[in-house]
Swiss-Prot record:
Effect of F105L: In strain: fluconazole-resistant isolates
Lineage top rank: taxon: Eukaryota
Membrane topology, as annotated: Single-pass membrane protein
This protein's encoding gene: ERG11
Residues that, per the record, bind heme: C470
Effect on the protein of changing E266D: In strain: fluconazole-resistant isolates
Stimuli inducing this protein: Induced after prolonged growth with antifungal drugs such as clotrimazole, miconazole, fluconazole, itraconazole, ketoconazole, terbinafine and fenpropimorph.
Species name: Candida albicans (strain SC5314 / ATCC MYA-2876) (Yeast)
Binding site for oteseconazole: Y64, H377
Protein name: Lanosterol 14-alpha demethylase
Length: 528
């Protein structure tokens, strides 16, 4: 009774206060509680140091969201490579550098979960039953199904299709119109997402599907892409216009794929050597005998194209801007391409998949772009069992998150000389080559979708690592290499003020801030 009376007396006292005093208490109590909680948390020796923050729940979201790499470096200087911060109600434990890559990417499946970290974000975009909306074992098999369309023989067929799409874009898009113009200005944040989706749909989904992928269809993918924002990560569904457009785009794209799948099945028109759709229609039965439904295949197609879209659109936009800042690098690539074609006695139309492997300046430019501008600045896993951090007394409790940032290591002077300088030639050195993970590493593991390098302690991991390593790395190099050689063979360009735009971290994928334009002119070898 004494406790009840005390509570009643407290309520009566609160009600007797003025409105101003009541509001002050209501606003002040959460802040006081937050400060006390942080102090008590800091006393625990089994927890990574927590970055101090003033605003409850919101935490360090502003400083992290605006400049994540600067935020990481500032925290590292104060706490070391391991620390935690509050992000919109979630405690993120960060482990920077190659040891952090090893800790997160090679963590046991029983200890961390990418599915629990991303499912609420990706399922409204991709659809149900695929990627993170299924057990990890299913995802590993889905990746294996997709890899049947990502073979060397497939890449050989893709190169001329990708080049043809780019050349057609040069003729038809208002940014270029190369049959009518000799010079002009192009916004790479318009051109590169479109070129990427047109080339990917043509090569991966076939000629019939490409005819459906007009600019209005590309806009649907743009609406889907807007579902990958920080607000979507926190609030998967809100009654807001961009959520409605995301959902409408998902339904329309999925229905389009379903129609094509149904048509091919009814016609019996399925060729295992044609494209990704046919490959999935043939290879889509799990080890336990369960078959993917056509709806799940359609959803997986969305996920695959979206994954590649992010990497290639952002990477090609960035390398066009950097090469515009340093046109002499374009000339190095141009001479390399021209000399190779001269030996063959042909022009750009004769450039093959095998030729792309003989162009070190092209591949080094892509590699350097991915170093400076990794599409995802942070990668999360949700902790499902208490997780001890090696060589420390820290334990990450169940329900918290671990965060790794290869992009931080890519741009840190601890691992790369002059990291802020765009220098493709750095990859010619033996030390730099040793930093990159080889496709043919002898230390390999098979998570269910084919062997990948087990080693993830490299400071350079643009395609991630472990069981969630991107399976599209080689396709990305084929697509990006063809885009780069086609641009350089036909055009020479600069950027205004010879200054590359700053990165925009407001979305989940790091893109250039607007305006992001190149000023182009035709080369003498231009094909129009």
């Amino acid at each position: 009774m004494a406790i009840v009376e005390t509570v009643i007396d407290g309520i009566n006292y609160f009600l007797s206060l003025s409105v101003t005093q009541q509001i002050s208490i209501l606003l002040g109590v959460p802040f006081v509680y937050n400060l006390v909680w942080q102090y008590l948390y800091s006393l625990r020796k089994d927890r990574a140091p927590l970055v101090f923050y003033w605003i409850p729940w919101f935490g360090s979201a502003a400083s992290y969201g605006q400049q994540p790499y600067e935020f990481f470096e500032s925290c590292r200087q104060k706490y070391g490579d391991v620390f935690s911060f509050m992000l919109l109600g979630k405690i993120m434990t960060v482990y920077l550098g190659p040891k952090g890559h090893e800790f997160v990417f090679n963590a046991k499946l029983s200890d961390v979960s990418a599915e629990d970290a991303y499912k609420h974000l990706t399922t409204p975009v991709f659809g149900k039953g695929v990627i993170y909306d299924c057990p990890n074992s299913r995802l590993m098999e889905q990746k294996k199904f997709a890899k049947f369309a990502l073979t060397t023989d497939s890449f050989k067929r893709y190169v001329p299709k990708i080049r043809e799409e780019i050349l057609n874009y040069f003729v038809t898009d208002e940014s270029f119109k190369l049959k009518e113009k000799t010079h002009g200005v192009a916004n790479v944040m318009k051109t590169q997402p479109e070129i990427t989706i047109f080339t990917a749909s043509r090569s991966l989904f076939g000629d019939e599907m490409r005819r459906i992928f007009d600019r209005s269809f590309a806009q649907l993918y743009s609406d889907l892409d807007k579902g990958f924002t920080p607000i979507n990560f926190v609030f998967p569904n809100l009654p807001l216009p961009h959520y409605w457009r995301r959902d409408a785009a998902q339904k329309k794209i999925s229905a389009t794929y379903m129609k094509e799948i149904k048509s091919r099945r009814e016609r019996g028109d399925i060729d295992p050597n044609r494209d990704l759709i046919d490959s999935l229609l043939i290879h889509s039965t799990y080890k336990d005998g369960v078959k993917m439904t056509d709806q799940e295949i359609a959803n997986l197609l969305i996920g695959i194209l979206m994954g590649g879209q992010h990497t290639s659109a952002s990477t090609s936009a960035w390398f066009l801007l950097h090469l515009g800042e340093k046109p002499h690098l374009q000339d190095v690539i141009y001479q390399e391409v021209v000399e190779l074609l001269k030996e063959k006695g042909g022009d750009l139309n004769d450039l093959t998949y095998e030729d792309l492997q003989k162009l070190p300046s092209v591949n080094n430019t892509i590699k350097e772009t991915l170093r400076m501008h990794m599409p995802l600045h942070s990668i999360f896993r949700k902790v499902t069992n208490p997780l001890r951090i090696p060589e420390t007394n820290y334990i990450v409790p169940k329900g918290h998150y671990v965060l790794v940032s290869p992009g931080y290591a890519h741009t840190s002077e601890r691992y790369f000389d002059n990291p802020e300088d765009f220098d493709p030639t750095r990859w010619d050195t033996a030390a730099a080559k040793a930093n990159s993970v080889s496709f043919n590493s002898s230390d390999e593991v098979d998570y269910g979708f084919g062997k990948v390098s087990k080693g993830v302690s490299s400071p350079y991991l643009p395609f991630g690592g472990g069981r969630h390593r991107c399976i599209g790395e080689q396709f990305a190099y084929v697509q990006l290499g063809t885009i780069l050689t086609t641009f350089v063979y036909n055009l020479r360009w600069t950027i205004d003020g010879y200054k590359v735009p700053d990165p925009d971290y407001s979305s989940m994928v790091v893109l250039p801030t607007e305006p992001a334009e190149i000023i182009w002119e035709k080369r003498e070898t231009c094909m129009f």
